[in-house]
């Protein structure tokens, strides 16, 4: 397993990016969330599939995923021979990790993509000893 400190890029297709933006906008005024499924190749993380998840908080300022829904998703991903490489969620503010995000980033050491429904900008982050920005690349393929 690759550690977060080795990851410098996360790569999405434009179609995947558009799906995440649509998920965020369709979930308004609440935050949205999804799991990013894929694999790693050296310092790059490739997203191959998206699993939209229900925000069980149904909140405009937070998200959570029901434990059983999360377990089911991880089992499905594992059966496909892939792994959860990231977590996506939207913010009603700047695309920056909140203090709550920081806490959960420590527990879930994957890339976190945060999309701002205000600025329509997405940024990616990892947490090791501190939060670091990861380059988010959107490809046309």
Q: Model-predicted segments: where are they?
A:
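Conserved beta-strand-loop surface patch within small alpha/beta domains used
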Residues: 2-84, 92-141
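Conserved, mostly hydrophobic/aromatic
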Residues: 87
């Amino acid at each position: 397993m690759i550690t977060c400190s080795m990851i410098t890029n996360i790569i999405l297709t434009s179609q995947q990016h558009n799906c995440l933006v649509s998920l965020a906008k369709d979930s308004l005024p609440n935050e949205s969330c999804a799991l990013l499924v894929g694999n790693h190749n050296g310092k790059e993380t490739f997203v191959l599939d998206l699993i939209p998840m229900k925000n069980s908080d149904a909140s405009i300022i937070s998200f959570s995923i029901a434990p059983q829904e999360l377990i089911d998703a991880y089992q499905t991903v594992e059966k496909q021979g892939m792994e959860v490489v990231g977590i996506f969620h939207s913010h009603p503010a700047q695309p920056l990790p909140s203090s709550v995000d920081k806490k959960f980033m420590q527990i879930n050491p994957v890339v976190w993509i945060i999309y701002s429904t205000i600025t329509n900008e997405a940024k990616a982050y990892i947490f090791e000893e501190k939060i670091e920005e990861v380059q988010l690349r959107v490809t046309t393929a």
